[in-house]
Swiss-Prot record:
Motif NDxxSxxxD/E motif: positions: 224-232
Originating species: Dictyostelium discoideum
Catalyzed reactions: (2E,6E)-farnesyl diphosphate + H2O = discoidol + diphosphate
Protein name (Swiss-Prot/TrEMBL): Terpene synthase 8
UniProt keyword annotations, A-Z: Lyase, Metal-binding
Induction: Expression is almost undetectable in vegetatively growing cells. Small amounts of transcripts accumulate between 4-8 hrs of development, continue to accumulate until they peak at 16 hrs, and decline thereafter.
Length: 312
């Protein structure tokens, strides 16, 4: 393709182009948690610790409606599990929006965050360890250990991606996925919604599991990038593959069609490798629930676009 490589997005290059996402259908059903009101009634009290004044906290809750997103993302857990997952989701959005995306922090911030004994924790450093302790109370130790590792990996990746503008318009979807894999957040989300399930390393290291999980992430990446494109159109970073593809093709419409085409392929791959995985380990009850949980999460993630203010 004959075009100059871009490291930032300029919406003025695409003025008057229509944003219309082609229709697609997921084969998995979404559900909603019966505990959604329990969290929504407590959300304001929870998030105010991260803001300098109460009005800012109120504005954040109204603008984002994370409670609605949580109800769709985590519909299968018991109340204790749902509450900690919902708090973590709020925590991640606020940490990313106000800390990591500010580009004012280096990795030493994460070093301090992950040091439980640090005497210089900010509200995020204090809260993340309270959340981890809560996960240990309701989840499986090995799965919570994995969640903590995934959180640290996500944090370091998010700081690097936001600060150093490593993404550019020359990337293929595979290159883009490899660049965004850490900061996108699907790994930590998968760890949080499956913290009560135990899937052994032997299974996680198998070819079929790695393929299944890769396509689960790719599927959600395309759902995210198509669903959030309109919201992110004013942001200059190329942390959205629709932007990357639009620069390559000179058209937002063609880029959206391309990304939905990828999504449809990834949906088929998720089902293909989940079937192979269940056939490979037919007597593993946690594995079947793990797969079902991630498919249900994906359906809820998709439903969240157009349902909560954050994505409108």
């Amino acid at each position: 393709m004959d075009y100059d490589i871009k490291f930032t997005w300029d919406k003025n290059q695409f003025l008057d182009q229509e944003i219309r996402i082609p229709k697609y259908t997921l084969p998995w059903d979404f559900k909603s948690s019966p505990f959604d009101k329990d969290f929504e009634n407590q959300e304001m009290e929870y998030v105010k610790q991260f803001f300098q004044n109460y009005e800012n906290a109120v504005n954040y809750v109204k603008k984002n409606e994370i409670g609605k997103i949580a109800a769709l993302n985590f519909p299968l857990g018991e109340k204790d599990e749902y509450m900690v997952n919902s708090k973590l989701l709020d925590f991640l959005f606020i940490l990313d929006d106000y800390i990591y995306e500010s580009r004012n922090y280096e990795e030493d911030y994460v070093d301090n965050l992950m040091d439980r004994s640090s005497k210089s924790h900010d509200p995020f450093g204090r809260e993340i360890w309270r959340l981890f302790d809560e996960y240990y109370r309701v989840g499986v130790k090995e799965s919570v250990d994995l969640l903590i590792r995934d959180f640290e990996y996500w944090s370091r990746s998010a700081i690097k991606t936001n600060k150093y503008k490593s993404l550019n318009s020359s990337l293929s979807i595979e290159d883009y996925f490899n660049s965004r894999h850490g900061d996108f957040g699907m790994t930590i989300t998968a760890s949080s919604c499956t913290s009560t399930l135990y899937v052994e390393n032997e299974i996680r290291e198998s070819k079929n599991f790695k393929k299944f999980f890769k396509y689960f992430e790719l599927c959600n990446l395309m759902i995210n990038d198509c669903g959030s494109f309109k919201m992110e159109i004013n942001e200059i970073l190329l942390t959205n593959f629709v932007k990357v593809r639009a620069i390559q093709l000179g058209s937002i419409d063609l880029a959206l069609k391309y990304c939905v085409g990828l999504l449809n392929k990834y949906i088929i791959k998720v089902d293909k490798y989940s079937t192979k995985l269940e056939q490979q380990y037919p007597n593993h009850s946690h594995l079947k629930k793990y797969i079902y949980t991630l498919k249900t999460f994906t359906a809820g993630h998709n439903k969240g676009y157009g349902h909560a203010n954050r994505y409108n």
